[in-house]
Amino acid sequence: MRKSKRERQRLLQETIRENPFVTDEELAEKFSVSVQTIRLDRLELSIPELRERIKHVARQSFADKVRALPLEEVIGDIIDIEPDASAISIFDVKEEHVFRRTRIARGHHLFAQANSLAVAVIHDELALTAKATIRFVRQVKAGERVVAKAKVTGKTKSGRTVVDVNSYVGQELVFSGTFEMYRSNMEKKDGDSNEYRD
Amino acid sequence: MRKSKRERQRLLQETIRENPFVTDEELAEKFSVSVQTIRLDRLELSIPELRERIKHVARQSFADKVRALPLEEVIGDIIDIEPDASAISIFDVKEEHVFRRTRIARGHHLFAQANSLAVAVIHDELALTAKATIRFVRQVKAGERVVAKAKVTGKTKSGRTVVDVNSYVGQELVFSGTFEMYRSNMEKKDGDSNEYRD
DNA sequence: TTACTTTTAGTACCTAGTCATAAAATCGGA
DNA sequence: TCCGATTTTATGACTAGGTACTAAAAGTAA
């Protein structure tokens, strides 16, 4: 059955959002209307043509790619970094990061921000978290901006680097953690458990 | 001065690699040759036309984005649960969960699996992680299946529930953590057959 | 000059559209 | 059921950024 205009336009938006590479012709076939109708729909919904959509997606990703490679894998945006000393990142808590019912941020996102910052601050080819002690000091809600501050504080006797990370919303401490990081270029060679290299 | 054919084609490749959004016309102007010459060059160098280049960039980034979205939600599948006692979940480590270079799983995914299992095992309206001590025992690689086992081990004097989570690949322990969970209804033991907190 | 490479020009055709106009089909209400 | 409005479809002219092909002009080396 052919849907109503409203319903078709709703589905059209959804379809294009899911697959921006779809042509008007394909959409026309999908909704059993003429190509002209699809074009009228796009006009009414202010959806740009295929090529413009593709260009937009490409431009975005190209801009992203220009960002430094190691920083790309960090959760949150690094705004300051002094290798092997300190680093700061910000992470905006959005709806997708919180429990639906309570709107409180899920712990692993705060952990991910802190952990990836601890990885980033270490100026080495390979950095992995060996151990961590973390404390969720207060709940973070959607809409809040979390500023994580990492500081390299020392080394364990086994040669691991210790990084302290404190995360704040405004002046308020919301998360704190101590990370023991394993790194590849340790001056002291220790018979650590099975490390994996490729 | 107009460069030799060889030199022009070398620069052409470089230019397009740096900016795939450049048209033949712009290139012709840049190298002071005709558009036809540029097209001949692309033909000889097997460089696709502008639209194909853009499409390629867009397709790549789109695939990445589709993979990145569920990354935020996937924290393992619960395969067994005994409320307020124990729970088991599995998590398949895929390419999107690992560091590209080393193919070692990023710590926050293992944490997320364990943490969300600790949340799930607590049979209450609200469960939040207050504190956690975790240990990454051995590195997990892409393709491996991580089985997390949570066990409620007791309570702190402040009334928090303590959950121990151990994660395995096969028989081998890869992650272990102790989670101190805050919960809303601490004394109440209602038979509320609630939904899973996502 | 001849022979060859390189460059330029021009044509027809393509896709996936744009914009504008007009006709046909469908729908809701009295 | 007819009327007017909305919605859909058709048509034509035009666009960018090409492909594919043919042909001629310009440059170069012997």
UniProtKB/Swiss-Prot annotation, chains A, B:
Keywords: DNA-binding, Fatty acid biosynthesis, Fatty acid metabolism, Lipid biosynthesis, Lipid metabolism, Repressor, Transcription, Transcription regulation. The keyword Ribonucleoprotein does not apply. GO terms for biological process: fatty acid biosynthetic process; negative regulation of DNA-templated transcription; negative regulation of fatty acid biosynthetic process. Residues 102-168 form the MaoC-like domain. It holds the Pfam family HTH_DeoR. GO terms for molecular function: DNA binding; DNA-binding transcription factor activity. HAMAP family: Transcrip_fact_FapR. This is Transcription factor FapR.
